[in-house]
């Protein structure tokens, strides 16, 4: 087990959950806070339940609320996103999930800083320890390749409190 990269650190969290015999691992990043007193109750809501299509919910994601109170990404004005705005695509996904009739819906997106994994999933599918960024999307792809899905809970979130950006434009572009 390594401590280099988000995937490797999350695998350490999964290993600790296994050592202590926990059946659910909940992840948050260090620049987030849980403002809801029922955060952990909402984290496990629906886990191991079956959908009407007889699909078992083993991994789910909540979402981020930015410092202004919005779950949507601000459109980037950087030249690096001139031709393809990740924010625009992300906001389409979020709007569809936020306005869904059901609280928990199937998702192609996972917020790595607000996710819950049941042992039935994380004992079969670890995070890729060699991925330094984007481990959440990679995990969704790995789930799919093993016949599982990620689910989105539109009533479970964390408040994002990012530190002041100190990286150079070149460094941000490389990420």
Task: Tell me the role of every PLM-derived stretch.
Residues 37-59:
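Conserved donor-nucleotide/metal-binding helix-loop-beta segment in metal-dependent transferases, i.e.
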Residues 132-139:
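Acidic donor-binding loop at a coil-to-helix junction in glycosyltransferase catalytic cores
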Residues 96-116:
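A recurrent flexible, glycine/aromatic-enriched loop bordering the glycosyltransferase active site
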Residues 1-16, 20:
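Active-site-proximal specificity loops/subdomain of glycosyltransferases
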Residues 92, 173-175:
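C-terminal, non-catalytic tails of nucleotide-sugar-dependent glycosyltransferases
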């Amino acid at each position: 087990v390594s401590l280099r990269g988000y995937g490797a650190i999350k695998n350490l969290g999964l290993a600790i959950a296994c050592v202590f015999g926990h059946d659910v691992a909940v992840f948050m990043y260090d620049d987030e806070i849980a403002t809801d007193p029922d955060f952990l109750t909402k984290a496990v809501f629906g886990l191991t339940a079956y959908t009407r299509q007889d699909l078992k919910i083993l991994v789910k994601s909540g979402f981020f609320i930015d410092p202004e109170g919005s779950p949507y990404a601000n459109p980037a004005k950087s030249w690096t996103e001139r031709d393809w705005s990740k924010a625009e695509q992300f906001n389409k996904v979020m709007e569809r999930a936020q306005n869904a009739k059901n609280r928990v819906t199937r998702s192609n997106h996972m917020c790595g800083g607000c996710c819950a994994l049941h042992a039935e999933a994380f004992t079969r599918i670890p995070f890729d320890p060699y991925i330094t960024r984007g481990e959440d999307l990679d995990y969704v792809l790995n789930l799919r390749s093993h016949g599982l899905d990620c689910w989105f809970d539109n009533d479970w979130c964390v408040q994002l409190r990012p530190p002041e950006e100190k990286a150079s434009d070149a460094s941000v572009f490389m990420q």
